[in-house]
Swiss-Prot record:
It comes from the Bacteria. GO terms for cellular component: cytosol. This is Protein RecA. Keywords: ATP-binding, Cytoplasm, DNA damage, DNA recombination, DNA repair, DNA-binding, Nucleotide-binding, SOS response. Gene3D superfamilies: P-loop containing nucleotide triphosphate hydrolases (3.40.50.300). Disulfide bonds: none annotated. It comes from Nitrosomonas eutropha (strain DSM 101675 / C91 / Nm57). It is found in: Cytoplasm. Can catalyze the hydrolysis of ATP in the presence of single-stranded DNA, the ATP-dependent uptake of single-stranded DNA by duplex DNA, and the ATP-dependent hybridization of homologous single-stranded DNAs. It interacts with LexA causing its activation and leading to its autocatalytic cleavage. GO terms for biological process: DNA recombination; DNA repair; SOS response. The gene is recA. GO terms for molecular function: ATP binding; ATP hydrolysis activity; ATP-dependent DNA damage sensor activity; damaged DNA binding; single-stranded DNA binding.
């Protein structure tokens, strides 16, 4: 670039920064832009790996969808618990009016510090979300769920009265407002969504999510969560086998998937993942029913090894860090500390 053009560009950039604030425009190669993406762990080691960056990105919109009882709310509560461990503030917009505080507490959420709102309609829910995001003091906001964001006009209208596209228009308008503030304040906003069936689809996938197409475009990450089986101890069912597919990912290669166990009353079983991934990467040796680490036996049968790792948390952490090193994934704790409101 010649000198005159360079001077003109420098003056234009200075004027833009003066008028709209520092950081309103910058070169992509600047250190502030090119630094590692800040993330928060999902609570699942295999899902952190599948996401490619070690967790869910900060300052982005995330969509988690799946059938009923597939683990959508459990996964988001696990993310909230991980954020709270880092000293972050979390808010839960309970549009379904179905949050169980006791269950949330069991899987590690500090319910005393959790902000909760049970709005009367969709407009109120999204206005509250926008105000929390703009405050810059909340690190994660979860909306449960898009399907329950009923527009005010629909609530006030007659039962059975057609209300074409109201919810889709509401979501589209709200996401246009939210996006810039979410990025500026580095807030993670997670929308939980439900699945519906398209009528008359002969070929292809008949499934679709509620709330129109806007969320599909604005979301940086979309996760499809499904229950794939049951976990039994004897005759008793104690949990679900769960599979999450990364359907969309703007921060790493998409289309990867993660399999993990959700245990009733406990949430995602981190120890089960460490066993499975440890064996896969030859960090844990398996001979028959016995499992060994560094030549020492750590248990017979998965359940016993899981209990052993629960009791020996330092050992579990050591194996986890070796797994992260094996898949070239940095320890997320270095990149997940929430910024202070002044930053």
């Amino acid at each position: 670039m010649d000198e005159n053009k360079n001077k003109a560009l420098t003056a234009a950039l200075a004027q833009i920064e003066k008028q709209y604030g520092k950081g309103s425009i910058m070169r992509l190669g600047d250190s502030d832009v090119a630094k590692d993406i800040q993330v928060v762990s999902t609570g699942s080691l295999s899902l952190d790996i599948a996401l490619g960056v070690g967790g869910l990105p900060r300052g982005r919109i995330i969509e988690i969808y799946g059938p009923e009882s597939s683990g959508k709310t459990t996964l988001t509560l696990q993310v909230i618990a991980e954020m709270q461990k880092l000293g972050g503030t979390a808010a839960f917009i309970d549009a379904e009016h179905a949050l169980d505080p006791q269950y949330a507490q069991k899987i590690g959420v500090n319910v005393q510090e959790l902000l909760i709102s049970q709005p009367d309609n969709g407009e109120q829910a999204l206005e509250i979300t926008d105000m929390l995001v703009r405050s810059g003091s909340v690190d994660i906001v979860v909306i449960d769920s898009v399907a329950a964001l009923t527009p005010r006009a629909e609530i006030e209208g007659e039962m059975g009265e057609p209300q074409m596209g109201l919810q889709a228009r509401l979501m589209s308008q709200a996401l246009r407002k939210l996006t810039a503030n979410i990025k500026r304040t580095n807030t993670t906003v997670i929308f939980i969504n439900q699945i519906r069936m398209k009528i008359g689809v002969m070929f292809g996938n008949p499934e679709t999510t509620t709330g129109g197409n806007a969320l599909k475009f604005y979301a940086s990450v979309r996760l499809d969560i499904r229950r794939t089986g049951s976990i039994k101890r004897g005759e008793e069912i104690v949990g679900n086998e769960t599979r999450v597919k990364v359907v969309k990912n703007k921060v790493a290669p998409p289309f990867k998937q993660a399999d993990f166990a959700i245990l009733y009353g406990e949430g995602i079983s981190r120890e089960s993942e460490i066993i499975e991934l440890g064996v896969l990467h030859k960090l844990i040796e398996k001979a028959g029913a016995w499992y060994s680490y560094n030549g020492e036996k750590i248990g017979q049968g998965r359940d016993n090894v899981r209990d052993y790792l629960k009791e020996h948390k330092d050992l579990a952490h050591e194996i986890e860090q070796k797994i992260r090193a094996a898949v070239d994934l940095a320890e997320t704790n270095n990149r997940t500390v929430p910024p202070s409101p002044s930053e």
